């Protein structure tokens, strides 16, 4: 590759300067990746390096003679050295009394750090030597340090303060960690001898440069340069949130599976979720979406505007345009924010969408956020961190998506979730991924995320007493305006999370109150399901006199405050319970017709008068 002006990234330039002033350097973040860097051996060219090689690329020009690397289970290795530096490195190994590529115990690693840091107290002169402690967190066994581990860190801390400069640098110790807090705060914080440098995830420009380098290895690449550049651009955009090493793995996967360059998005998807098939792009889904308005309208009654709005958003998801306007195609396939009164079909519509999109109502994962109002409930979703009970089990959300990435994920009553969970939702909406308690990455790029809320229906009034903000006497446009206004107030001002509101604002779908016509149809369907159960279980028919049916419908739809759920509960109380008593006392014979003449109250219960 021949870039015009290859330069080191900012984090590596920071390390270059830190070598002159800090005897110890702590590296965190994206420490396990490949890095696209200038090739020291060929001016004007770049190549991909691992972290240790990248460190040597800046240490050697600074006059360092050798680079040693230690990792748990492997031991210490001499990675690179000049002839003079090799002599110095061998002296370090002798002083520490360790051999290369042999596992070391804690005391030996402590001796190794001591031998490196104090090297110039034992020799007349020579080039500086650096030691890289890869996976430094694995040196420690748990959250609570043992006496030996505390002695190890105390020794490293003391050595940093007594280190002597060697020419333009020190005999440097590099600590390599995924997270800064993997080391105790007393060691890593406020220590002016220790430079902390974070290595960021590759941004779009880095991914684009990498995509251009790697795309030549993709099968069936177009011959036209403009088309090849377009493939590289799509590769870079589709790999949002991925590391360069993962991009290299995507190319290998595409080559092995025979996925052509023009379908690089499919290769990225297969790498992320483990399956090359994409239900979102199936012709069957697009056909179902074209006729879905009627189907969803018969399942979720009385919400034609909400259904239409949802289908508009799903059309964008099915055509792959979600996130296209931002250049970020790693966002979830779609996001819906259902708002409205209770019992009007929000949850039912989410279930219906799972069946519509993926052919299975069970492709649906629901979390009641009232159960996640405590701070520790985060562990239930993404898994407990290392050292805590349940760490090996993982989280309900992350496990569910890992097992089946193509599904509807419903977060019910989002306003009841703990504030820390809102950070996780923001990460899902922005990046389409989460890191679970075990450190693995889970991708939501093929999921439909649905939030529901009752915000804006009842709001705090004077003295914080609840006041109805909307009523069933209002028309839908007024209801929608009032509900949207309160949702904005809630996120922007009451909980101070405007960034979350900005992510869902265009996905808000406001549901209407349940109107009498839809309520009667829900009641009639519920009665029909009861009759079907009698026919299925007893072989008998259930019939009603006109007056009994009218009484039942009137009672069921008298109070619509609790929506369809209230209608079903009323029919359960008025019809199902007394019917169960009747069937238990006098079981019907197959073919018998059971006819309800009247329904009468009896104390707190109801009885059926049978003909």
Where are these regions (language model features)?
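ATP/nucleotide-binding catalytic cores
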Residues: 1-263, 393, 401, 426-430, ...
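AAA+ P-loop NTPase nucleotide-binding core of proteostasis motors
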Residues: 11, 18, 23-26, 164-170, ...
């Amino acid at each position: 590759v021949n870039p015009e002006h290859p330069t080191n990234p900012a984090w590596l330039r920071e390390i270059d300067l830190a070598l002159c002033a800090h005897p110890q350097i702590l590296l965190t973040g994206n420490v396990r990746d490949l890095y696209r860097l200038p090739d020291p051996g060929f001016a004007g060219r770049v190549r991909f390096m691992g972290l240790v090689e990248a460190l040597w690329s800046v240490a050697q020009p600074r006059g360092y003679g050798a680079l040693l690397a230690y990792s748990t289970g492997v031991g210490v290795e001499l990675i690179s050295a000049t002839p003079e530096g090799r002599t110095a490195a061998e002296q370090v190994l002798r002083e520490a009394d360790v051999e290369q590529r042999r596992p070391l115990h804690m005391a030996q690693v402590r001796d190794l750090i001591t031998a490196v840091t104090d090297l110039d107290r034992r020799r007349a002169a020579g080039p500086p030597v650096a030691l890289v402690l890869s996976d430094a967190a694995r040196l420690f066994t748990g959250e609570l340090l043992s006496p030996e581990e505390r002695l190890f860190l105390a020794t490293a801390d003391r050595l940093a303060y007594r280190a002597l400069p060697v020419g333009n640098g020190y005999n440097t110790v590099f600590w390599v960690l995924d997270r800064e807090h993997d080391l105790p705060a007393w060691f890593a914080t406020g220590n002016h001898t220790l430079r902390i440098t974070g290595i960021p995830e590759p941004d779009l420009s880095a991914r684009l440069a990498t995509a251009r380098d790697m795309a030549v290895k993709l099968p069936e690449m177009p011959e036209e340069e403009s088309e090849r550049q377009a493939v590289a651009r799509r590769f870079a955009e589709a790999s949002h949130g991925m590391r360069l090493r993962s991009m290299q793995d995507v190319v290998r996967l595409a080559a092995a599976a025979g996925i052509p360059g023009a379908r690089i998005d499919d290769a990225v998807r297969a790498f992320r979720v483990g399956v090359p098939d994409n239900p979102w792009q199936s012709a069957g889904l697009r056909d179902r979406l074209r006729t879905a308005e009627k189907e969803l309208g018969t399942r979720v009654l009385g919400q034609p505007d909400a259904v239409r709005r949802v289908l508009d958003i799903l059309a964008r998801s099915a055509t792959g345009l979600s996130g296209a306007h931002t250049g970020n195609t790693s966002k979830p396939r779609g996001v819906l924010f259902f708002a409205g009164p209770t019992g009007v079909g929000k949850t039912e519509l989410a279930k219906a969408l799972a069946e519509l999109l993926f052919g299975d109502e069970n492709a649906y994962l629901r979390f009641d956020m009232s159960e996640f109002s405590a701070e520790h409930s985060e562990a239930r979703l993404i898994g407990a961190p290392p050292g805590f009970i349940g760490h090996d089990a993982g989280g309900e959300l992350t496990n569910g998506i890992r097992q089946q990435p193509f599904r509807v994920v419903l977060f019910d009553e989002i306003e009841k979730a703990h504030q820390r969970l809102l950070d996780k939702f923001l990460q899902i909406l922005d990046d389409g991924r989460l890191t679970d308690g075990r450190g693995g990455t889970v991708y939501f790029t093929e999921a439909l995320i649905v939030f529901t809320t009752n915000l804006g229906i009842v709001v705090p009034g004077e003295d914080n007493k609840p006041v109805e903000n909307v009523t069933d006497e209002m028309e839908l446009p007024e209801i929608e305006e009032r509900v949207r206004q309160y949702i904005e107030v809630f996120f922007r001002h009451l909980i101070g999370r405007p960034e979350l509101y900005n992510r869902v604002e265009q996905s808000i779908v406001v549901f209407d109150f349940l109107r009498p016509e839809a309520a009667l149809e829900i009641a009639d369907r519920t009665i029909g399901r009861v009759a079907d159960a009698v026919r299925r279980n007893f072989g008998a028919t259930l019939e009603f006199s006109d007056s009994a049916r009218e009484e039942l419908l009137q009672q069921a739809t008298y109070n619509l405050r609790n929506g369809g759920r209230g209608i079903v509960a009323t029919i359960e109380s008025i019809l199902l319970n007394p019917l169960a008593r009747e069937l238990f006392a006098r079981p019907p014979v197959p073919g018998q017709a059971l006819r309800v003449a009247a329904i009468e109250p009896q104390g707190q219960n109801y009885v059926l008068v049978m003909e």
